[in-house]
Amino acid sequence: MNRIYRVIWNCTLQVFQACSELTLRVGKTSMVNLRKSSGLTTKFRRLTLGVLLALSGSASGASLEVDNGQITNIDTDVAYDAYLVGWYGTGVLNILADGSASLTTITTSVIGANEDSEGTVNVLGGTWRLYDSGNNARPLNVGQSGTGTLNIKQKGHVDGGYLRLGSSTGDVGTVNVEGEDSVLTTELFEIGSYGTGSLNITDKGYVTSSIVAILGYQANSNGKVVVEKGGEWLIKNNDSSIEFQIGNQGTGEATILEGGLITAENTIIGGNATGIGTLNVQDQDSVITVRRLYNGYFGNGTVNISNNGLINNKEYSLVGVQDGSHGVVNVTDKGHWNFLGTGEAFRYIYIGDAGDGELNVSSEGKVDSGIITAGMKETGTGNITVKDKNSVITNLGTNLGYDGHGEMNISNEGLVVSNGGSSLGYGETGVGKVNITTGGMWEVNKNVYTTIGVAGVGNLNISDGGKFVSQNITFLGDKASGIGTLNLMDATSSFDPVGINVGNFGSGIVNVSNGATLNSTGYGFIGGNASGKGIVNISTDSLWNLKTSSTNAQLLQVGVLGTGELNITTGGIVKARDTQIALNDKSKGDVRVDGQNSLLETFNMYVGTSGTGTLTLTNSGTLNVEGGEVYLGVFEPAVGTLNIGAAHGEAAADAGYITNATKVEFGSGEGVFVFNHTNNSDAGYQVDMLITGDDKDGKVFHDAGHTVFNAGNTYSGKTLVNDGLLTIASHTADGVTGMG
């Protein structure tokens, strides 16, 4: 093939060059020094044109190719169209302290170009600028189809444009930036484009990326970054939309340790469906600061914060973003995930936005954030685990199951502090669950509500010394579709809100058992509004306490505007200042005190305030009336019924007792006092309190047992003895018979 050669004078090198096609092929000598010196100039001046043509081979003087065992040193200013190091064989290019290499045109430079090739560029105090004469960034492929390595040390400086490590399938590219004032600047940085790429920044080395940084770009690629020992990577510019991607379609891993630093804008881990990304932040003073963190966008993402490592989030974070994605954050061994700034608008965390998300905090790990929501969208599933002493989440609110499924487990003295409203089962499709066990605690502060079952389903389970404390009201079953359940399971477990509303507009259930304690010293409402249905079961030596030394509220209301039911059984105890059953004319309330040592203790007792209320004392269950007064059917059109033993028309049961009462009074509604018990002894069931009231609708039913009235009763209405024996032990001179 005919070739055209031309001899030109290179002003930079001060030599004649014979140019042909695209590249200058440096001969197969072991060492070439490209430097500005009189000897080099004289040597080339003595060469004949034929020798110059022979040196040119099949390449052009526009590119520098270092290959076939060649080692080339640059310690002066040079400029080429491209740098090709390790084209088919092995090549080493050293850019030394006084060396400055730059580009003249738009060609891509390559280290480790073809299969089985191996190229190395060492920038040892020199400068390599990969921009053309028009200041346009040009590509550098490190490990194109072979193996490529770029080492930047001894205050070396590389101005990179588009840098790709492992740019083809099966190839390997590595960049090492080591030492203070050793610098790599890039615009687009792909670490593992199609093959395998590694970036190591150590000993205060410094790297910047101003457009995008990607680890594991294409499917089956692998990108790995280690930033350590004061190394730093800055991934940002004036545009906050710049992205740091870890595991785009391939596998990516970034590790920050021993004081390494990364600063980035939007960070995406596990970007696409095939993407697998991992971010590790470990050791004291190891920090990554990001604007927004997307962990598991379409793919799989994992964040590990450990050993005092720190992540600073300027705005929000989504973990398990899209349907089918999976994201995990592990904060352990004094690691810290911190959200900067104030307010809740940009500091929130979604664990399981539309995908599957996990947040695990253990071994003194710490999270400080805005509102945390687990199970945000309908397809989202979020799980939060906080365990071990001094492991803490502090946030502006906790939502479990917004429209999806959310669960939180607090154990082994782990702590969650919510300084804002919190909910379980927010939307109609939302399902939220919280388990507090083995000394775990959830505190809700700042005078805000906690709602279990807003419009969805919420469950709060407390056992083995778990604790819940709130500075305000807790609602169960807030909206009509809401279903809320609270289970307190043992003697060391407690639930301490200011007040509790069980079945506000929806359905609420509270079960307190095995010696557990529920404190709601403001008030307790069961069946709060017209559509509300609430049930509270206090059993097996457990306590519901509504009393304090304060004179404020402390009311127990069963059937406020809706339907309420309170069951005190097997030694359960309820203490309140005043107890009211069925407050509204359309409300309904039922209270049952059943069993030895079962106790309802209240100052005054109102059964059927304006609605239909029933109190049943059976099987030695006791009503202790500290204020001495019991009212039945207080206002029209109320119906208030007090059953001793069993209800009228039912099979007789063992009687319960009233202590410290001075009177039972029928109000202006309908009062009903039923004696249907099994005490048939000669002494009978003793009734010492006065039965009084001017309500002509008042009734005393005697269905079974032997009952003895000891007071001079003055009630109006009827006394109906259907069965059993009623003894009147009080007869006065003015004609009061004790039968009303």
Where are these regions (language model features)?
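Extracellular beta-strand repeat scaffolds in secreted/surface proteins
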Residues: 91-93, 121, 148-152, 175, ...
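Extracellular glycan-interaction patches encoded by glycine-rich segments
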Residues: 83-86, 107-114, 137-143, 164-168, ...
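Surface-exposed loop/turn positions within long extracellular repeat scaffolds
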Residues: 78-79, 132-137, 159-160, 185-186, ...
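Extracellular disulfide-bonded cysteine-rich modules/repeats
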Residues: 5-7
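Small-residue (G/S/T/A) turn/hinge positions that recur once per unit in extracellular repeat modules
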Residues: 69-70, 76, 91, 99, ...
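Short, solvent-exposed linear patches
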Residues: 87-90, 115-118, 144-148, 168-173, ...
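N-terminal segments that cap or nucleate solenoid repeat domains
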Residues: 60-104, 150, 254, 359, ...
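Gram-negative bacterial Sec-dependent N-terminal signal peptides
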Residues: 12, 17-19, 24, 28-60
